[in-house]
Every structure is written in structure tokens, then in C-alpha cells.
């Protein structure tokens, strides 16, 4: 469960190291974001010569949470850290060209198929 002020790792090579959620998109009083939800983030730590810099405000899709996701068969998939993939504000396509770490099957769909195809492992 990601809410405002939550810190996440960037799971791509966009140049951001850590980001902070500043808004959960999708409803006026929506409080929490789960895997597959789009959030608004600001870059808190970035590497030199990256595509994004500290202070940039971007959209991101949540790909891993400590809370996890429950499958219809009753199993739960949890991760050690919260992580997201940064998106272009206009096209909502990933900024980076590589994805680090596993992503879940819940991301499969029309919007995030590119992220699933770039990921090294889909759980």
C-alpha cells in the first residue's frame, strides 16, 4: 500500500534512485495505491547524467510493494521493497529502457505490456 509521502525505489534505468509519492491518481479522495496503479512522484535522489534529475515531478506505476498482491488461488506475492517504474507524463510509456527486478503478472494489460516485456522476470 503506497500513500502520499511513501518512498519508493526506481526499478528502471531512468536515472532516479529513490522517489517519493506525492499523489495517488484515480479518484479525488483515493488514499492507497497497489501494484499496477499510477501515482505522481517526485525524484528525491538521482544519478549524474541520468534522464531525470532531482526535483522532477513524473508519473510512475507501482511494480512491487511490501504489502503484496493476493491472487485468486489465495496465494500472496510480497516483496522486500516498494518499487516503481517512471513514466512519461504525456504518453505514460516508461522513460527507462531496462527494468530491474521482478514484476507481477497483474501488470499485464494494454497499458503496461511494455514494462512486462522489459522485465527480467514476471511472477
Swiss-Prot record:
Family: Belongs to the universal ribosomal protein uL14 family.
Top-level taxon of origin: Bacteria
GO BP: translation
GO CC annotations on file: cytosolic large ribosomal subunit
HAMAP family (alphabetical): Ribosomal_uL14
UniProt cross-references to PANTHER family, sorted A to Z: 50S/60S RIBOSOMAL PROTEIN L14/L23 (PTHR11761), LARGE RIBOSOMAL SUBUNIT PROTEIN UL14M (PTHR11761:SF3)
Alphabetized Pfam families for the sequence: Ribosomal_L14
Gene label: rplN
UniProt subunit comment: Part of the 50S ribosomal subunit. Forms a cluster with proteins L3 and L19. In the 70S ribosome, L14 and L19 interact and together make contacts with the 16S rRNA in bridges B5 and B8.
PROSITE patterns cross-referenced by the UniProt entry: RIBOSOMAL_L14 (PS00049)
Protein name: Large ribosomal subunit protein uL14
Alphabetized UniProt keyword annotations: Ribonucleoprotein, Ribosomal protein, RNA-binding, rRNA-binding
GO molecular function: large ribosomal subunit rRNA binding; structural constituent of ribosome
InterPro entries: Ribosomal_uL14, Ribosomal_uL14_bac-type, Ribosomal_uL14_CS, Ribosomal_uL14_sf
Function per UniProt: Binds to 23S rRNA. Forms part of two intersubunit bridges in the 70S ribosome.
Amino acid at each position: 500500500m503506497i500513500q502520499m509521502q511513501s518512498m519508493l525505489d526506481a526499478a528502471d534505468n531512468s536515472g532516479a534512485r529513490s522517489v517519493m509519492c506525492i499523489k495517488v491518481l484515480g479518484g479525488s479522495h483515493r488514499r492507497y495505491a497497489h501494484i499496477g496503479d499510477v501515482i505522481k512522484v517526485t525524484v528525491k535522489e538521482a544519478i549524474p547524467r541520468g534522464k531525470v534529475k532531482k526535483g522532477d515531478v513524473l508519473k510512475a506505476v507501482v511494480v512491487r510493494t511490501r504489502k503484496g498482491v493476493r491472487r485468486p488461488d489465495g496465494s500472496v506475492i510480497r516483496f522486500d521493497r516498494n518499487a516503481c517504474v517512471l513514466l512519461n507524463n504525456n504518453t505514460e510509456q516508461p522513460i527507462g529502457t531496462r527494468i530491474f527486478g521482478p514484476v507481477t503478472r497483474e501488470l499485464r494489460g494494454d497499458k503496461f505490456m511494455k514494462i512486462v516485456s522489459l522485465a527480467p522476470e514476471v511472477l
